[in-house]
Amino acid sequence: MATPTQDIFPLLDLEELVICLQSCDFAMATEEHIARPTSQYVITLYKQIIENFMGISPEQVLAEQLSSRQNTEGNDESTSVDMFDGPYRETLQMLTLNKICYKFFENVGINDFNIVDLYKPEAYRTRRLLSAVVNYARFREERMFDCNQFIIQMEEMLDELKSKFDDFNYLKAQLTAIEDDDEKTPGELEDLLQKNKVLETNLKKLTILQEKLSIDYNNYKMKKQELLRELEKNSFTLIELESKKERLMNYNDDDQDLQNSLNNSIDRLTEEKKKQIGYVSKLEGNVSNLKVTVDTLEKAIEHIYDILRLLSTDLQESHRAELNIEGIKGPLTEKRTRLKNLLESNVIYKYDVLKEQLNVAETEYQRINEEHYRETLENKKLIQELEGKYNNIIHNKMQEAEVYIENEITEKKIKILQSELNDIQIQFNNEIDNIELHYSTLVGHINNYMKKLITALNNH
């Protein structure tokens, strides 16, 4: 038990304590109840205190835990309801209240609060605990105006935190959608790459064919020019021959042989001219067909280039999408790690608090055992002293009135002393049994709670 000199707050007397508590809207605070506290009274008063200063209650915490278990366990909902509504409900409420009170009183300057302060409250400890509450209320009232700025900042940070959680959920949904699309993308990407390879092969073939046709077309143009020059030359020759023919027609008929020879030459040249004209027409038809083929090939090549551009655009978009996915995965993974670390640290903190409370309870139990052992030794010593005194009295009185002492006084005193000793022993044994019963019940509930908590953590 801590002494007043170890506390950071003053120990108030009952009258001042009651006035301060009633000014804080705790109407049930009276001198009589605080001077002789009962378990039911301090439990009700502490519930009002933590609900007023912390804004929570054991029932609310249990309801939230029940709702959380129903959401996470699914089919095991009936088991959770039985655990919270069954015979353990009152015990869970007391453990929850003890945990909340331990944290609250630790914050206001008391580090040795334990469950005994709820089940078997002492007047001095109750007065000390309530003095800490009054000191905290005074400090809170004095510093409330200084905390307005921090309250505003806290609200802004809470709003920002909610916004971040909304952004996180949105990014998580986007990541899920992208991952779903990403599972389908590899197959489509492979198909596009395969089609792209086929189109590239066809494009190479068409490019080679285009080059070959271009060479043939250039050769054709050169040959056409040569034929046109030859045709022009033959035309000039024909014109000259026609001119000569006209001049020769003026000669007399004696030159019939020469005329026949000239006519034959003219016919031969005319026939050759017709052949050249037919060949030129055929070449022009081939050129027209070749132009149509070249135009068709150019259109096909342009179409293939358009397809390649589209494929390149799709590949670039897929690459950008993959980069965006990688960029989003990094922050999301980091946020997930931070949230996981935060949850693990919170669970470890709760486990440490329970472990600390268990250590305090074990220390209190050891102290009670030591007091019991010490009181037992004192009782044995007292019995031995009484027996010694009794023996001395009997020895002295036996010399004076042995028959009277044996029949009357000795039996009467022995019965009275034996009755008193039996009453003291029975009362002491009852107190020890009650303490051991409460301690074993507490340890059992704590073990069950820790097992269920560990099971819940493993399930998560």
From Swiss-Prot:
Pfam families: Nuf2 (PF03800). The keyword Cell division applies. GO terms for biological process: cell division; chromosome segregation. Keywords: Cell cycle, Cell division, Centromere, Chromosome, Coiled coil, Kinetochore, Mitosis, Nucleus. Residues 155-304, 349-437 form a coiled coil. Its main location: nucleus. One of its GO terms (molecular function) is microtubule binding. The keyword Glycosyltransferase does not apply. It is found in: Nucleus; Chromosome, Centromere, Kinetochore. GO terms for cellular component: Ndc80 complex; nucleus; spindle microtubule; spindle pole body. InterPro entries: Kinetochore_Nuf2_N (IPR005549), Nuf2_N_sf (IPR038275). Belongs to the NUF2 family. Acts as a component of the essential kinetochore-associated NDC80 complex, which is required for chromosome segregation and spindle checkpoint activity. Component of the NDC80 complex, which consists of NDC80, NUF2, SPC24 and SPC25. This is Probable kinetochore protein NUF2. It comes from Candida glabrata (strain ATCC 2001 / BCRC 20586 / JCM 3761 / NBRC 0622 / NRRL Y-65 / CBS 138) (Yeast).
